[in-house]
Each structure stands twice: as C-alpha cells, then as structure tokens.
C-alpha cells in the first residue's frame, strides 16, 4: 500500500466517524520558542490549554501534520530509525469521547480488512502498553477489544504518561506496537525489545493537570481538567514500512527513490559499504526535509530555522561529493522528492520553482568553498595526527565557518569521521568575540565612539524614566553631560554633547524606529536634540547641539519632542505593522520579519521569502494595508506577560529575547497583533495613505519592501501624477493608453536598432575580404588580429571571425577581433582545425588578450570570447596575442 493511500484511509476513517478534517499547519508557527512544529497536537494546543474553544463540529477533529525534529540530525543515516521530517496522523476529541472511543477507533482502523477501508494489520501481531495504574484502559483492551492479557504491558510515568513538559494538561497514554517477527529480535513484547516491536500509535488520555517539575515523570498531578480530551498520534512512515513489508523508512516509496537517484548521480552502490550507506540515507532524509521546509518559506541563513535548513542542504551536498558526485546534484534529489511528496502535498507543484531556485542558489554558494574548506581541514587533520593531537582547535573551526561557510555541526561531523574532537568552547568564544566586536562597533558609531564605561554609573544607579508614551514634553533634571568622551559640568553654545536626564519624553532608537528629534531648554540655555540612543537598555543618551547659552549638570530643563517629527514617525511605524500583516495575508505565515527601519514618512521592511514578488502581489499588499487605514481600526497597547501575549496570538520574532513582561500593539483586533515597544498612532486612519515603492533582494532568502506614509506618500503620488501627465502631453496620448504607446515605441526602437546592427554587420562582412588581406604569417600560422570599428557587438564579432577564418583557407589560421561597444570591450578568437591540431587554443588567446583590457574570457580551442573594460589596451592585447603565437 502506497503511503498516500495510507494517509487517505486514515482521514476517511475519521471523517466518516464525524471528525472535522483539519489541513496540516505550516511547519512554522508564531511561537518564538518553537523552532518547528514537532508533534501532531501542536496546532491544537490552544484548545487543550483552554485558551480557545474548539471550532469543530461534534468536538472532534483529525489531521495529518507535517513535523520536523532536529535534535537527532547527527543520528540520521547512522541508524535507520531517525528521520528529521515525518508525518503524524492524529484524531482529537475535546470532551466528545474518551478512552473506549479512542481505543476502538484505533483498533478498527488498524485491523479492519483493506476492502472495508482498514489497514489490514494482523491482530495477532499487535501489542499494547498502558500506564501502570490505568486499569480502565487495560480492561478496555482486554474485555472490549479482545487483546490477550499477556500482550497488554504496563509501564511507568517515564514511558506511558504524557505532558507538554510544563504545567498544564497531562494524562496517561496507551501505545500500540507491531511485532515484526522473530528475525528482528527476541520475544516478549515492547518492554523486552523495541527493535522487534515498533510503536505505531500513541493514544493520550488527557484528563489531569500537572504541576512544576523536571523530566518526563518527575512532576505532581495537581488537579483534574474540566473536560476529558483525546490526543493521538500515528506515525505514517512507520505504518508504511509495515504495509510495504520493508525493514525501514528508507526502503519505502517516499525515500527509496531518492536513494536510487543518488546511486545514478554518484556511481556508488547502496548496500555495499556502511559509511556510504549513511551518506545515501542523509541525502534521502535531508532532501525531503529541506524541500518541505522551503515549501513553508524557510530560506538558508546563519541563525534559527535558516541555519537548520542550511545545515541540511550542505550535508546533502557534502555527502553526494563523498559518494563521488561532481557538479550540482541538489536539483535531481529535489525533483525526486517532488514526485514522491506531491500526491500528498499538491501545493509543492505551484511552489516548486521557488524551492528549486533557493536550493540551487545555496548549492552554488557552498560549492565555491566546499573544496577549499575540505582541503584545509584534511591538511590540518593530517598534520595534527602526525603531531599526536586529537582536537580541532576553536580557531580552525572558526575559520572554516567564517571563511568557508562550514556550519560548526559539519566541522564536528568531519572531525568525528577523522576520529577527532572539536574545541567547541573555543569556537563559541571566537564567535562571541566577533559578535561583540560588531555590536561594540555599531554602538560606538551610535554613541560617537565614546568609551561606554563612562555610562556605567548612570546604568547602575540612575536609569532613565521614559514618559514618551503619554507625553511630548516633560520637565527633567540634567544628570550628566559628556563632551569629547569626558564627563563635564557644562556645555556652552555651539558645543556638541551627550546629555543624560532623569526622565525623558524622547523615544530612543529601537525596534527599527528612528529616535525622536526636538529641543531641551533651561533658564540658561537651549539645545537641539538630534539623536537619542540607549545604553544598557536603561539610560537614554541625548545627542544635542547647544543652540544658545549653556546647559549645566543639575539644572532643570524642559524636554520637548518635535510634534511633527513624532507624528510622521508614528505613521511610519504603524504603517510597518500594517505592511507586515498584509504581507503575511498575501504570502503566507512564513513571510516573517527579518528587520525594519522607519523614520518620518518612510519605512522599509525586510522579510524572509525566497523569490521576487510579482507586481500583482505588491499591489495586493498595498491595497490590503490601505484597506486597514480606511477601516480606521483602533490601535491598542497592552502590557502583559509573555505567555499571555502568546496566548492572545501576538506575533513574536523567533530568536528574539523577550522579558517576562512585554508590550503588545494591536491594530484592529486580529488584523495585526505584535510584540512592540515603539510609538504608534491611535487609529489606523492616522497613518494616511501608504505608497509601496517596490521590493528588492537584500541577501539570500531575504526581500525588502519600501513605502511612504502620510504626506510623503501624498507627495510621491503627486510627483507620479505629474510624471504621467507630462508623458501624456509629450506623446500626445491619453494617460490610460500610455503603456500601449510606450510598448509600441519601444518595439519600434528595438526594430530600428536591430536593422542598424544588421546593416553594420553587412557592411563589415563586405569588408572581411579586405581584412583577410591584412593577415600576416607567424611561424606556420596565418594570423589576422585587428580592432574593428566602434559599436560591433559580441555576437557580430563572433560571426565575422568565423567568416574570416573560413576565408583564410585550410592552412593553420587564427583570427582575433576586438571592438569598443559602449563601455565594454568585446573580443573574440577563432582557430581553424589545422591550427588546433598544432596545439593552438582560442581560449588561451582570449585570456592573453583579456589581461591587457581589464577583462576575462574563455571557450573552446576552436572558438572563444570575452569582455573587458579598458579600450586603451586593445593594441597591447593584439601584440600580446602575436607574441604568444611567436612562442
């Protein structure tokens, strides 16, 4: 039975029984503490925790959830039991049925004949386990289902009591095992041999509430849940192994085809060598996981989810190389995964070009450094063994990471293969130093390269009170003044200084929002506030220029934020939230923020996405964001605990460190809800019009949208309107017909340019006969090396060179032509068969020529071409070619 049919039978069984089918959630959820969805019940957590009411008819649901677990990446391939991606089929009840219902459903589906919609497993080969004290479940299995008592084994809390690992719902569970037969191990049930008896289905009877505690079974039961719930999980891949009668998941219809393709690509044979078998299995497992992660929008990166994907893809590439592959291989593996997984996940087909592009870009990037990095490691390992060393130093691992792009896990893997260890602490120290240097340099730039220890007394003893959420002005005391890197008592007129106040209404740069501008005044002077930065997240440092009189430590000042600046900054920041929400509505939940910057009237928003956005998508995003503006949503800020914020559905950034108390900015209820400490408008209508300028790439898998808000958006639209009006007047065409008019003019221009090129080529071709007469003999070779008139494109040069070569006859002959085409210097070399037989290579000649014109080129012995940028070197290039032919 094919895996896709197993999935269908599972869903059909439960939907016929009144369960609501729930599509698989994305592998990526809005949970900063969860790398990937790793269990079938994860999307249902809000219902089990009582945070939301289950919306399912009859109070029951069924799903087949995509899952990824990455703790065992290093074990993948070494054993046949570990996979990074798997499919968890489950049925869920929220007070509708309990133990007897769950047990009956599972047994019926597993043992009913295939012709009746079941999976047709032999009941005699099924064993079950129950929690030690769960007499009720044991009795149901024995009395209701008919499982013999000796096949019902009891286990303790460590094995048969489920919880989420934190205080909350929990309960005993019952697991169903399949006996693979005596050839797989000793008799006696799962408590004796879990290799022979494999777990296929876990039934969790969620009825209690657990308290604090560590470990699987080290906690107390503190109460009963108001409803008794059911959460089950069946491993699709494990059932496929049984029904396809194969030893492990790598032999199933999902992964074996990838191994077969890997054999073709590499020339190695699966099953012939243990080390190579591990590599084959790594390729199969990681190719599937990689594709499914990219399907859900993950792109390779250096942190978090992106790092996991990068690690998986680079393990595939290296494994293929070690098996004997040359060149690029990922596309073939991904193509095979597409074929095996699309029947279950048809969305792969419409997203495949994006997935393929992301994978190939990562492969090209890694192949550039794989060989040099591997050579560096091999050389070091050889020398280290000769010295009797057994540990790769942290600096070597750091160099492989920093220079060659080797994830530390890959270096550890290579070290293990060479019977070496890695100084992982030393590596992390160097990584931390690098990050600290970058952070210190960034902070130093922001703080005017002042030694930050000067701020320590203020950070420790006088944290700034921020009043800017409520006020645009406040009275404050001057606690400190810094000039030229030193604490001073006063700052005179014209001086640039950093001023520290006990309280301030000025927003300091944070969260992508530019700092407020404004002024501070006292009885003795005034200063312009030109920037505000935080030190130690506690002290606001105001960068000022004293505009009159002087400021002094200890005096009172009136700190006033520029009202217009703040208003436009608030528009941009709230506009950023609207753009983010619109992006996710158009592109899906994987379009997660990667960075942002907003200043008065302007915003830019970076997000994880693997391909260029279409004009239609940009228009959709702009329309949705402006629709939110038009809806005049209320903007609310809520200060609450991190857990409560997540329960509310507030979006948090993965990998970001949040405190126990957070601030939630909510725009229009569910439309946008994010953790944010920034300044925002009171109503979405105050953002004003949002004009999306466009989008661009800012790195591998990261795109950027830029937009204007408020009056800047209006001015942009006004300028665009004037531009369109001017074009319409110049072209004597109504504005709505401009696109067609411009297309027609462009087509005419291209046709005219093509005609000019053809006429020029004909003219030059007519002159080829005259050029051939200029050929000279060098040794035994006829050589025609000339600079042609300006404006001859590379393609025409090639045609002319071929014509000239043919006219020079059958004796050894070489042609080298060059021209100046705009800012480029195209050049070409052609050699006839007789010249090639004498060892002359056109590719070598263009390399010689290219050195003189700041260019490069290459090709085959008979024809090669290149391009340079220094037209002044053409004559020298011609002479260099002639010298090379003279020998």
UniProtKB/Swiss-Prot annotation:
Cofactor: Zn(2+)
Cofactor binding description: Binds 1 zinc ion per subunit.
Annotated keywords: Aminoacyl-tRNA synthetase, ATP-binding, Cytoplasm, Ligase, Metal-binding, Nucleotide-binding, Protein biosynthesis, RNA-binding, tRNA-binding, Zinc
Reaction equation(s) it catalyzes: tRNA(Ala) + L-alanine + ATP = L-alanyl-tRNA(Ala) + AMP + diphosphate
Enzyme class: ligase
GO cellular component terms listed in the entry, alphabetical order: cytosol
Record-linked Pfam families: DHHA1, tRNA-synt_2c, tRNA_SAD
Keyword S-adenosyl-L-methionine: no
GO biological process, one term: alanyl-tRNA aminoacylation
Keyword Membrane: no
SUPFAM superfamilies (UniProt xref): Class II aaRS and biotin synthetases (SSF55681), Putative anticodon-binding domain of alanyl-tRNA synthetase (AlaRS) (SSF101353), ThrRS/AlaRS common domain (SSF55186), Translation proteins (SSF50447)
EC numbers for this chain: 6.1.1.7
Major location (coarse): cytoplasm
Entry function: Catalyzes the attachment of alanine to tRNA(Ala) in a two-step reaction: alanine is first activated by ATP to form Ala-AMP and then transferred to the acceptor end of tRNA(Ala). Also edits incorrectly charged Ser-tRNA(Ala) and Gly-tRNA(Ala) via its editing domain.
Record remark on domains: Consists of three domains; the N-terminal catalytic domain, the editing domain and the C-terminal C-Ala domain. The editing domain removes incorrectly charged amino acids, while the C-Ala domain, along with tRNA(Ala), serves as a bridge to cooperatively bring together the editing and aminoacylation centers thus stimulating deacylation of misacylated tRNAs.
Annotated family: Belongs to the class-II aminoacyl-tRNA synthetase family.
UniProt name for this protein: Alanine--tRNA ligase
Annotated organism of origin: Corynebacterium jeikeium (strain K411)
Taxonomic placement: Bacteria, Bacillati, Actinomycetota, Actinomycetes, Mycobacteriales
